[in-house]
Curated annotation (Swiss-Prot):
Modification N6-succinyllysine occurs at: K150, K162, K178
Disease per UniProt entry: Combined oxidative phosphorylation deficiency 45: An autosomal recessive mitochondrial disorder with onset in utero and characterized by poor overall growth, failure to thrive, global developmental delay, poor or absent speech, seizures, hypotonia, loss of walking, acute progressive neurologic deterioration, brain lesions, and facial dysmorphism. Laboratory studies show increased serum lactate and decreased mitochondrial respiratory chain enzyme activity in patient tissues.
Chief location: mitochondrion
Coiled-coil segments: none
Protein name (Swiss-Prot/TrEMBL): Large ribosomal subunit protein bL12m
GO molecular function, one term: RNA binding
Organism: Homo sapiens (Human)
Domain of life: Eukaryota
InterPro entries: Ribosomal_bL12, Ribosomal_bL12_C, Ribosomal_bL12_C/ClpS-like, Ribosomal_bL12_oligo, Ribosomal_bL12_oligo_N_sf
Cross-link Glycyl lysine isopeptide (Lys-Gly) (interchain with G-Cter in ubiquitin): residue positions: K150
Subunit structure: Component of the mitochondrial large ribosomal subunit (mt-LSU). Mature mammalian 55S mitochondrial ribosomes consist of a small (28S) and a large (39S) subunit. The 28S small subunit contains a 12S ribosomal RNA (12S mt-rRNA) and 30 different proteins. The 39S large subunit contains a 16S rRNA (16S mt-rRNA), a copy of mitochondrial valine transfer RNA (mt-tRNA(Val)), which plays an integral structural role, and 52 different proteins. bL12m interacts with NOA1.
Matches recorded under Pfam families: Ribosomal_L12, Ribosomal_L12_N
Length: 198
């Protein structure tokens, strides 16, 4: 008990405390889930009994079971329409099917064999860009070759072109379109050079 001198100061607090006890004694619906679980022993046992175990079969809500039954009764055309509508509604992009080994084992053997043959044969792509490389030069035609090289390499003078021809093989131009590479090759071979397109 509080001393008599302190009672006037604590009076309002004691009144609140008494009101709280009175409120707690009444059966007021619980707001807090933890207090609700603590206060109702029977409901707590039901909640624990309803928790799924790892090895127990999962029980699905009746709404889900009804959906499965409804979908199972649809025809293939109706399933296709349902699939299309779900993709539009849920904004799912259409992704092609990726065949798996187990699924494809007996499904379409001829198509699978055709795909296997196509995968084994490498497709030769036609190259579109080449590197023009000068490999040899005839000593008689060096002067003509130096002048022609000066036409195809920008910013090179005669001395640099002469050094380039004397230290073969050399790259003349890289990453050139096929038509231009053949044009350069024809021009350099016309003045006595041996050119390789790589």
């Amino acid at each position: 008990m509080l001393p008599a001198a302190a009672r006037p100061l604590w009076g309002p607090c004691l009144g609140l405390r008494a009101a709280a006890f009175r409120l707690a004694r009444r059966q007021v619906p619980c707001v807090c889930a933890v207090r609700h679980m603590r206060s109702s022993g029977h409901q707590r046992c039901e909640a624990l009994a309803g928790a799924p175990l790892d090895n127990a079969p999962k029980e699905y809500p009746p709404k889900i079971q009804q959906l499965v039954q409804d979908i199972a009764s649809l025809t293939l055309l109706e399933i296709s329409d349902l699939n299309e509508l779900l993709k539009k509604t849920l904004k799912i992009q259409d992704v092609g099917l990726v065949p798996m080994g187990g699924v494809m084992s007996g499904a379409v053997p001829a198509a699978a064999a055709q795909e296997a043959v196509e995968e084994d044969i490498p497709i030769a792509k036609e190259r579109t860009h080449f590197t023009v490389r000068l490999t040899e030069a005839k000593p008689v035609d060096k002067v003509k070759l130096i002048k022609e090289i000066k036409n195809y390499i920008q910013g090179i003078n005669l001395v640099q072109a002469k050094k380039l021809v004397e230290s073969l093989p050399q790259e003349i131009k890289a990453n050139v379109a096929k038509a231009e590479a053949e044009k350069i090759k024809a021009a350099l071979e016309a003045v006595g050079g041996t050119v390789v397109l790589e």
